[in-house]
Amino acid sequence: MNAENTGSTSEVQLDNGIFRVTRWTIEPDGVIPMHRHDYEYVVVPLVTDSMHVRNADGSSTVADLKAGVSYTRAAGAEHEISNPDGTDDVVFVEIERL
C-alpha cells in the first residue's frame, strides 16, 4: 500500500485477529501522514537511522532507531512520521496487539 504518494509504503505481513504485523518503508523526504494508533504496538527497526515524529499536539522529536532494538508505545499515540533529512529509506516492522 502506498500512502497516496507520500513516499511511504506499508505491507501487512500478518493479520490474524490477535496481531497485525506491518512492514513500513519511508523514503528520503517521505512521510507517514498523521494517524492514531488504536492498539498498543511494538516497533522493530530494520535499519539504524533516525526519523522525525510530529505529535498531534504540535510537539516534535527525533527518534533514533537502532536495527533490531525494539520499543513499544501505548494505544492512543497520534503522530506523523517523516524522513526529511534522510539519504536512505527508514524501514521498520510494526506489531499491533489487536
What label would you give each PLM region?
Residues 2-34, 38:
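N-terminal first-folded block
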Residues 31, 50, 69-70:
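Residue-level marker of beta-strand positions
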Residues 32-34, 52-53, 78-85:
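Short beta-strand His + acidic residue motifs that chelate non-heme Fe in jelly-roll/DSBH
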Residues 57-76:
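Short acidic-glycine-tyrosine-enriched beta hairpin
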Residues 75-98:
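Ligand-binding loop in jelly-roll beta-barrel domains
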Residues 36-52:
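Short, conserved beta-strand element in jelly-roll/cupin
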